[in-house]
Design a protein with these regions (language model features):
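Extracytoplasmic
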Residues: 11-45, 63-66, 150-151, 232-238
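Extracytoplasmic gate region of multi-pass secondary transporters
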Residues: 30-37, 214-269
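Conserved MFS/SLC helix-loop-helix module at the cytosolic interface between two early adjacent transmembrane helices
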Residues: 61-100
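Helix-to-loop junctions at the C-terminal end of transmembrane segments
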Residues: 62-74, 266-277, 363
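Structural signature of the two symmetry-related core transmembrane helices
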Residues: 77-91, 280-295
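Paired small-residue
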Residues: 89, 100-108, 292, 303-311
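Intracellular juxtamembrane helix-capping segments at the cytosolic ends
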Residues: 115-128, 318-331
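Helix-loop-helix hairpin linking two adjacent transmembrane segments in secondary transporters
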Residues: 139-190
Length: 394
């Protein structure tokens, strides 16, 4: 019986997407409650941001560690382990009375949340061959769906009961939605189907004559480069708009445009990857992102910035999933979780480094122009690695 791209594969994709939508909220919850914890603990905005910073550190490390776990124990046990970690973290967060304890708990919540990103992407990729690109893109979009769906649902709870009850709701959702759904993902792909997929991967990799280790390192460096570049507009667009005199509300709208464009781009690039392959799709996305960064330099009018932000969102959304697609196209399926998780960890580190670096450059120069140029240079590093891989394939 055919397993790749089967009806069961698509059913499994829907279940995995539901798991991702619930599981990834651990990354967004601290963003939702940030103003409330700042007020309750009487702290400044930078201190109130510490929980989010540690969430991202946990999320990055978790992608690497949970990737190895999924290779050894399967996705069901990995999701259950992550659900337990997050549930304990949510319940404990309801009891804290200072931001530092909350920050420590958010590190572990970020760690558990990671299982619903890289490892879930890797597991889903096993069940697709011809439609692997769009399947990976859909699962990777679970992170965006989570950020779009959950925050509006929490508004009434925040206003009536406070931020602690939000954690309580998440604990219940994790127990009663994530864990039951994970049991629907127990079935594993057959060894025969995996061998067929691995044979195709080996043929591709032999054509570029690169070891799995070297390819993973190159993709990791490329991931850091593209995400340092990507972080400049995403992390600093609100501050950039304030500097230009447009105010934070306009910056928030531009960020929303980027995220909406990112979802659309992610899906389009998934379809593109099924036609062209992951490497060429990555080249297209990286090149378009670089062009969008250049466009921020000459344009500072309100309408033009809205347009450029939309263009940026449409260019960058498909870049990160392309790394997972390349890994599955060129490397053994048995190592998919480990290698996808590691590269995803590097992309997240790139976002963190880039966000800090852009702020540091702004502090030195008093302008975001140099920060945009910094992002463009890092983007060129990413593009050069992709071109190297394409050249090796000729």
């Amino acid at each position: 019986m055919k397993e790749h791209d089967s009806l069961y594969s698509w059913f499994r994709l829907v279940i995995a997407l539901l798991v991702a939508t619930v599981g990834n909220i651990g990354m967004w919850v601290v963003v939702i409650i940030l103003p409330d914890i700042q007020q309750e603990f009487t702290i400044d905005r930078s201190t109130a941001s510490i929980p989010f910073a540690l969430t991202m550190v946990g999320f990055a490390i978790g992608n690497g560690v949970m990737g190895r776990v999924v290779d050894h124990y399967g996705i069901t046990k990995t999701i259950i382990l992550a659900a337990i970690i997050n549930t304990v973290g949510y319940i404990a967060a309801m009891q804290v009375n200072n931001v530092y304890l909350l920050s420590i708990l958010q590190f572990f919540i970020g760690f558990g949340t990671a299982a619903s990103f890289g490892p879930l992407i890797a597991d889903t990729s096993h069940w697709f061959l011809k439609r692997r690109g769009i399947a990976v893109a859909l699962i990777a979009s679970g992170n965006y769906f989570s950020g779009a769906i959950w925050p509006p649902l929490f508004n009434s709870a925040l206003q009536s009961d406070g931020w602690r009850d939000v954690y309580g709701i998440l604990a219940l959702a994790t127990i009663f939605i994530m864990i039951p759904l994970s049991f629907l993902l127990t079935k594993k792909i057959s060894e025969e189907t995996s061998r067929a997929s691995d044979a195709a991967s080996e043929n591709r990799r032999s054509s570029v004559n690169i070891s799995p280790r070297t390819l993973t390192i190159l993709l990791s460096i490329a991931g850091v480069g593209c995400c340092v570049a990507m972080s400049m507009p995403q992390v600093h667009i609100v501050a950039f708009c304030i500097d230009l005199g447009y105010g934070p509300a306009v910056g928030a709208e531009m960020l929303s445009l980027m995220l909406i464009g990112g979802i659309i781009s992610r899906l389009i690039n998934g379809l593109l990857a099924d036609k062209l392959g992951g490497v060429y799709t990555l080249l297209i996305g990286s090149t378009l992102q670089c062009i969008a960064l250049f466009l921020y330099l000459p344009f500072d009018g309100l309408v033009s910035l809205y347009i450029v932000s939309a263009v940026f969102g449409l260019s960058q959304g498909g870049i990160v999933p392309s790394y997972a697609i390349i890994i599955r196209e060129y490397l053994p399926s048995a190592e998919a979780g480990t290698r996808v998780g590691f590269v995803m960890m590097c992309t997240i580190m790139g976002m963190a480094i880039g966000g800090w670096m852009s702020g540091w450059i702004y502090d030195i120069t008093g302008s975001y122009a140099a920060a945009f140029w910094n992002g463009i240079i890092w983007n060129f590093l990413n593009i050069s690695i992709v071109l190297f891989l394409i050249n090796r394939n000729r």
